[in-house]
């Protein structure tokens, strides 16, 4: 006798399959919302659509990070929170740096985070509505992922390590094979001055 899954279990499985790509896509939009301070149709047309390849790659990075953390820990809320932070924290720093000096966040700015926080405070720059809204959305998705993935089947360590290794390898390939290769990023239309 074969076991046929119920409609409810199929819906739950479908929701669990759709959650990571949809949540990480939403995190990508929140990242843009935070960095620009607003998200409108004009933002989509002027900044996102012309650089669709770059945004697709950024979404892929957030998705792969979600998958790697989930495979390793089997704790979806942690995967959700970390992938959201990976996008939203640099966007927050970028927003403040644009406010302070008129140019985007650059990797070496990480060395000056504490100094920048003091300058931002002295300059009267405050938490923006986009950051609060994004925080609420991230919190809701993190809590929602707890309930969505609660009670899911435990996997043996071998499967978990294999999934983690595959996700991590794909993440590294994306970082080292695309993002850190100027010729590749240039061929995809990802230019340093395109984000100003």
Predicted regions span which residues?
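Transmembrane and membrane-interface helices of multi-pass
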Residues: 9-195
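Short, basic, low-complexity termini and linkers enriched in Ser/Thr/Gly/Pro
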Residues: 1-11
């Amino acid at each position: 006798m074969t076991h046929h899954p119920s409609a409810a279990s199929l819906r739950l499985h479908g929701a669990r399959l759709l959650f990571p790509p949809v949540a990480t896509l939403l995190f990508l939009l929140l990242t843009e919302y935070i960095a620009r301070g607003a998200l409108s149709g004009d933002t989509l047309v002027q900044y996102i659509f012309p650089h669709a390849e770059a945004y697709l790659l950024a979404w892929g990075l957030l998705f792969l990070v979600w998958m790697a953390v989930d495979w390793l820990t089997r704790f979806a809320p942690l995967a959700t929170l970390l992938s959201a932070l990976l996008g939203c924290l640099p966007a927050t720093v970028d927003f403040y740096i644009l406010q302070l000096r008129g140019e985007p966040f650059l990797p070496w700015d990480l060395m000056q985070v504490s100094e920048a926080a003091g300058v931002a405070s002295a300059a009267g720059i405050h938490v923006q509505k986009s950051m609060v809204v994004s925080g609420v959305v991230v919190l809701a998705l993190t809590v929602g992922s707890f309930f969505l993935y609660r009670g899911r089947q435990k996997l043996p360590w071998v499967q978990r390590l294999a999934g983690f290794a595959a996700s991590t390898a794909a993440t590294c390939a994306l970082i080292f094979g695309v993002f850190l290769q100027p010729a590749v990023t240039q061929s995809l239309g990802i230019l340093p001055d395109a984000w100003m």
